[in-house]
Curated annotation (Swiss-Prot):
The gene is SLC66A1. Residues 34-100, 184-243 form the PQ-loop domain. The keyword Cell membrane does not apply. This is Lysosomal amino acid transporter 1 homolog. It comes from Homo sapiens (Human). Residues 59-71, 120-134, 204-214, 276-291 are cytoplasmic. It is found in: Lysosome membrane. A motif (Di-leucine motif) lies at residues 288-289. GO terms for biological process: intracellular amino acid homeostasis; L-arginine transmembrane transport; L-histidine transmembrane transport; L-lysine transmembrane transport; lysine transport; transmembrane transport. One of its GO terms (molecular function) is L-histidine transmembrane transporter activity. Signal peptide: none annotated.
Length: 291
């Protein structure tokens, strides 16, 4: 889910004990062990998010029923949140690492949507034009919105050092938000809501099917791990100089909700995997039992 925005301060403002490579590579001033742990957990969470989609691609190839296993609204909610994340990366003028990560998320979502439509319409090609047109229209709207939002105000906020699965991060200081920061905060909140709502259709789909076949649990397990590590990285980070812990948490609340809030819903999906897997195993063994 998103990374906090970190200041692009001169190295003179960083204590001499800070780790040089963290500053050089990420632009992050790690002042103590808490900051170093925050950076480490953040980087690991990026790897978790990057690896989460590959098991689902493999599962889709093996089972061929991805269109039945995954909810379309789940995928649309996910790509909507990631698209807000990508737009936010331009608004916040983030480091290349964040921008590349955000682009990867959207590309991975597009691949997953492509697989979904492929398996759904491979036997009914005549019905394929409508959803493709809808997706293309959505992408065109996103492409048009990006330059408009980028020109909404001056880039007054410093760059971010790194970012997780999806939300725009906003500098939380004592000074008032600029107009562009307010826009970024709103986009981050929308992205958070989209991530929360996206799980509900998938939970409903699993419940109606009474099965999770065709879904790779690694997809949700790695996302849960990534969101947990991201949330911890936010909580471990020291507030900016002169900023209280309460103010820090308040300014990062939407992104904490977007990362840690979805854990409850992902836990429900995990329980569905456990329950329906046992039900499937029991139904397969039942004909073998003596009458």
């Amino acid at each position: 889910m998103v990374w906090k925005k970190l200041g692009s301060r001169n190295f003179s403002s960083c204590p001499s004990g800070s780790i040089q490579w963290i500053w050089d590579v990420l632009g992050e001033c790690a002042q103590d062990g808490w900051d170093e742990a925050s950076v480490g957990l953040g980087l690991i969470s990026i790897l978790c998010f990057a690896a989460s989609t590959f098991p689902q691609f493999i599962k889709a190839y093996k089972t061929g029923n991805m269109d039945q296993a995954l909810s379309l609204w789940f995928l649309l909610g996910w790509i909507g949140g990631d698209s807000c994340n990508l737009i936010g990366s331009f608004l916040a003028d983030q480091l290349p690492l964040q921008t590349y990560t955000a682009v990867y998320y959207v590309l991975a979502d597009l691949v997953m949507l492509t697989l979904y439509f492929y398996y759904k319409f491979r036997t009914r090609p005549s019905l394929l034009s409508a959803p493709i047109n809808s997706v293309l229209l959505f992408l065109m709207g996103m492409a048009c919105a990006t330059p408009l939002l980028s020109a909404a105000g001056p880039v007054a906020a410093p760059r971010e050092a790194f970012r997780g699965r999806a939300l725009l991060s906003v500098e939380s200081g004592s000074k008032p938000f600029t107009r562009q920061e307010v826009i970024g905060f709103v986009i981050g909140s929308i992205s958070s809501v989209l991530y929360l709502l996206s799980r509900l259709p998938q939970i409903r789909t699993n419940f109606l099917r009474k099965s999770t076949q065709g879904i790779s649990y690694s997809l949700f397990a790695l996302v849960m791990l990534g969101n947990t590590l991201y949330g911890l990285s936010v909580l471990l980070k020291n507030p900016e100089e002169g900023q209280s812990e309460g103010s820090y948490l308040l300014h990062h609340l939407p992104w904490l909700v977007g990362s840690l809030g979805v854990l409850l819903l992902d836990t429900i999906i995990s329980i569905q995997f456990l329950v329906y897997r046992r039900s499937t195993a029991a139904s397969e063994l039942e004909p073998l039992l003596p009458s």
